[in-house]
């Protein structure tokens, strides 16, 4: 695979942006301009380059609005996103909402009550003419992951769903996006609690808004990377009728342990923290990952964040059985053989003990970056959409007329 940067991590993150071009998330030329300004393993140059690109795109959008060019404005606002600080992410959300208002399908901005707070959410309704004739609209809940924002999730699911007659609900839960930065709510391993709150509100809003025509008997949950872990957790709720687990890990603690020197666990906490910070000064990727973990988990130190991440497992921890063994709905599990992470896809698949191989559980293992072999299927969204929606159509009994 061609690499834009020597760093596998930075190259993956660049592909993550570039891969959204087909769904209006970026313009290829703008990405190449940004890449020329980014230094390898330099977070500051990364931020500066994308900020400049976002500001230019936002200016273009405002100009297009002033002359009535909705198409240019939609493109511009969809890609003028920046997520560094609260002020920046708030601006990103505002621009995304401007883009949504210019889409050719309805978008509802919602709030989900959760433990005294209100989680922001979007409901992307299908494009007119794509609805299933004579039936209500099936629903996809797209849960984010470790470092995504829900505005990014649009490209991974809703952009394809709205063209195929599906409704998509995205939201930001504790430890994610603006909820983390504004409300200081931190991530939790038992994500089924969050999904339960989302489903409760979805049922209430659907009853209050019959015009949405939502089918509450056909709800799927979709997640990529850490979102795949969250999706499996959410699938414990029997209101979920299908689950897409895209490139997930079974045990996040194990992933951390495999990259940590064995002697660290025997050192005094303060000394271990100092040593860890020194070692990470030479490792950009791990330094970013642990620093982000400390933020999303609300810990005061990197070593404490490392301890907390051990709780994020599909194993029996605090349960009678591992999570996958209690899932009853059909599950599509995907692999990413070119992932920069060591996935545990086979372990997840084999743990779905209530499922029949190739029937109620299916494994998709694409070969090649262009076919979807990177983590979360970045840079291959058309293949992601084709595979996921073909499977969902079958499981949720969505009937389509063959093209002439």
Spans of model-derived segments:
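Catalytic histidine neighborhood in serine/cysteine hydrolases
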Residues: 352-373
């Amino acid at each position: 695979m061609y690499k834009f940067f020597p760093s596998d991590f930075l190259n993956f993150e660049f592909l993550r942006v570039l891969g959204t071009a087909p769904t209006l998330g970026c313009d290829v030329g703008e990405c190449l301009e940004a890449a020329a300004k980014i230094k390898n393993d330099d977070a500051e140059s990364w931020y500066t380059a994308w900020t400049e690109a976002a500001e230019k795109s936002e200016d273009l959008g405002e100009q297009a609005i002033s002359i009535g060019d909705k198409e240019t404005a939609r493109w511009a606002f969809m890609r003028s996103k920046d997520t560094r600080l609260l002020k920046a992410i708030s601006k990103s959300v505002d621009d995304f909402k401007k883009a949504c208002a210019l889409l050719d399908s309805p978008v509802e901005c919602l709030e989900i009550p959760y433990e005294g707070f209100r989680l922001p959410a979007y409901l992307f309704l299908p494009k007119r003419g794509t609805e299933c004739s004579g039936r209500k609209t099936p629903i996809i809940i797209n849960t984010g992951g470790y470092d995504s924002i829900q505005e990014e999730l649009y490209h991974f699911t809703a952009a394809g769903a709205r063209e195929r007659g599906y409704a998509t609900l995205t939201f930001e839960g504790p430890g994610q996006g603006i909820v983390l930065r504004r409300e200081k709510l931190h991530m939790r391993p038992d994500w089924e609690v969050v999904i339960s709150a989302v489903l409760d509100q979805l049922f209430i809003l659907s009853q209050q808004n019959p015009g949405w025509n939502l089918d509450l008997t056909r709800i799927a949950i979709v997640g990529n990377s850490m979102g795949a872990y969250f999706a499996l957790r959410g699938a414990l709720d029997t209101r979920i009728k299908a689950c897409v687990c895209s490139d997930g890990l079974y045990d996040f603690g194990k992933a951390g342990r495999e990259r940590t020197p064995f002697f660290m666990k025997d050192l005094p906490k303060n000394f271990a923290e100092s040593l860890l910070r020194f070692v990470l000064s030479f490792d950009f990727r791990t330094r970013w990952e642990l620093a982000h973990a400390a933020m999303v988990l609300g810990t005061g130190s990197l070593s404490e964040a490392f301890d907390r991440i051990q709780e994020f497992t599909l194993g029996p921890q605090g349960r009678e059985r591992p999570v996958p063994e209690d899932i009853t709905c059909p599950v599509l599990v995907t692999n990413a053989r070119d992932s920069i992470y060591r996935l545990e896809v086979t372990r997840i698949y084999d743990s779905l003990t209530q499922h029949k191989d190739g029937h109620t559980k299916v494994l998709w293992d694409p070969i090649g970056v262009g076919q979807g072999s990177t983590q979360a299927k970045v840079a291959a969204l058309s293949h992601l959409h084709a595979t996921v929606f073909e499977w969902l159509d079958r499981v949720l009994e969505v009937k389509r007329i063959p093209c002439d």
